[in-house]
């Protein structure tokens, strides 16, 4: 199977090659702001067609496993969806969570309130309640859990992980949910707090496969939302000495994930991984791309090739909501090629102003925009990029490496263009290749061609760029 996606002024190609060549080759195209549709494919040839850049699937080898594409499910998104008629809500969820739409299979939950909640809360705001006698997830039952259960009905294969924005205020320096640090004398009670959350969700039929110690541990969001600051040493100590043992003692398979912040934090991650017990205690390193570049994590992946890495948050900015899908495809491909096995967006649904959020001032847009006036659900450009992966790449696929061969010709060099590529091998043996091409600003439109080699045959894929 072969799928190709085209868009105005840029080109994003997603290729699936099955095991019997032409009979299983299909081409799909998405034009700018349009729908994906199947188009006629070219023929495979036994001879190379010129000295082109080549995606050589015959030479590719396994890199690391693909764990899925996802989106976060904050209270704000669930509140907006709760106001819709049931069937309308189900239509939107099917668009996001099935392969007829974006094909997402991973959901990120917030432990307590986040910047995209209706108000600030935790699950135990009773000051000094070290026994957690007042612990309750009733706030999540208002909007979040009903939507989570509808997502499970739409796609029972969805997996969940969770991140906290802040411990209860009474556990922290300064007694404020916004900013500050967790008091060391409360590491134990906070680990038990996180365990109680995971158990409470389990009782609701929601299995939390992983938990990060803290969302963005080096950001206090200028006091605008729940946050908590952690040094690398504090985070590592909490995971190794408190959180991982508490999860094990409770009989939970949930794994702690390290960091959950930007690519520019590689030095901190290096130091944390060198701390005694960290590698044995964590299930992955989690990343955000708001600062730094995906390539910065490659040395960590090379040093620890069996340590999973995942992208846990990145969504559209409200001022750049219509940023083209190639920008997102480029980021995703570079992230996969740098060692991450999964990519999760930020808010599932927001309105056209990026609302609601806890302060009213945060600038994020939704994976899907729900217009507050018309009620229309508009997929973002990020959604359209996700769709080219989510429809075709299956959980457990190998993310391949060693497949790109630069051709020796002016045509291949394409000095005015930039090409990025990612390749996958699904559990059923089908091959998926995503190729992104874009011209330098001001360059004339002309064909962009890349040669795909599979089972000693060749296929030229072409699009206008």
Each model region followed by its residue ranges:
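Sec-dependent signal peptide recognition
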Residues: 3-12
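Boundary at the C-terminal end of the N-terminal hydrophobic targeting segment
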Residues: 20-23
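N-terminal catalytic cores of secreted or lumenal carbohydrate-active enzymes
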Residues: 33-208, 241
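Structural recognition of the beta-strand scaffold that forms the well-ordered cores
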Residues: 67-75, 105-111, 115, 159-163, ...
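Short acidic/His/Gly/Ser-rich catalytic and metal-binding motifs that mark active-site loops
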Residues: 116-120, 168-175, 217-223, 266-268, ...
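Active-site neighborhood of glycoside hydrolase catalytic domains
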Residues: 188-210, 217-319
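Aromatic/acidic polysaccharide-binding cleft in carbohydrate-active enzymes
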Residues: 308-393, 398-408
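Carbohydrate-binding surface patches
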Residues: 406-462
């Amino acid at each position: 199977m072969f799928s190709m996606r085209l868009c105005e002024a840029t080109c994003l190609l997603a290729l699936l090659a099955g095991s019997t060549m032409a009979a299983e080759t299909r081409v799909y195209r998405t034009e700018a702001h349009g729908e994906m549709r199947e188009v006629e494919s070219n023929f495979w040839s036994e001879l190379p067609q010129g000295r082109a850049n080549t995606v050589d699937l015959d030479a590719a080898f396994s890199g690391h496993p693909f764990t899925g594409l996802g989106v976060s499910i904050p209270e704000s998104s669930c509140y907006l969806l709760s106001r819709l008629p049931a069937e309308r809500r189900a239509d939107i969820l099917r668009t996001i969570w099935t392969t007829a739409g974006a094909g997402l299979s991973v959901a990120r939950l917030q432990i307590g309130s986040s910047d995209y909640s209706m108000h600030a809360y935790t699950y135990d705001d009773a000051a000094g309640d070290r026994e957690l006698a007042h612990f309750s997830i009733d706030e999540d039952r208002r909007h979040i859990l009903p939507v989570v259960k509808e997502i499970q009905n739409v796609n029972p294969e969805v997996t969940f992980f969770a991140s906290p924005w802040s411990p209860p205020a009474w556990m922290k320096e300064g007694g404020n949910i916004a900013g500050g640090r967790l008091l060391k004398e409360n590491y134990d009670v906070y680990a038990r707090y996180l365990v109680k959350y995971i158990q409470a969700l389990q009782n609701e039929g929601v299995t939390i496969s992983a938990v990060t110690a803290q969302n963005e541990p080096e950001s206090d969001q200028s006091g605008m939302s729940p946050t908590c600051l952690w040094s690398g040493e504090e985070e590592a100590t909490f995971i190794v000495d408190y959180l991982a043992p508490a999860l094990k003692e409770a009989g939970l398979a949930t794994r702690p994930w390290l960091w959950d912040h930007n690519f520019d934090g590689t030095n901190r991650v290096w130091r944390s991984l060198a701390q005694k017990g960290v590698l044995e205690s964590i299930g992955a390193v989690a990343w955000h791309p708001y600062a730094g570049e995906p390539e910065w994590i490659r040395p960590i992946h090379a040093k620890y090739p069996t340590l999973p890495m995942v992208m846990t948050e990145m969504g559209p900015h409200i001022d750049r909501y219509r940023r083209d899908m190639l920008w997102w495809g480029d980021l995703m491909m570079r992230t996969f090629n740098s060692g991450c096995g999964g990519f999760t967006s930020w808010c599932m649904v927001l309105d056209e102003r990026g609302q609601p959020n806890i302060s009213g001032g945060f600038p994020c847009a939704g994976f899907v925009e729900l217009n507050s006036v018309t009620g229309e659900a508009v997929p973002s450009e990020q959604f359209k990029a996700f769709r080219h992966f989510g429809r075709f790449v299956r959980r457990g696929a190998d993310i391949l490496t060693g497949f790109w061969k630069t051709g020796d010709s002016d045509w291949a060099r394409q000095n005015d263009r930039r090409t990025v590529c990612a390749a996958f091998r699904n559990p059923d043996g089908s091959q998926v290749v995503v190729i992104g091409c874009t011209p330098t600003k001001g360059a004339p439109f002309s064909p962009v061609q890349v040669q795909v080699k599979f089972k000693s045959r060749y296929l030229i894929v072409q699009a206008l760029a």
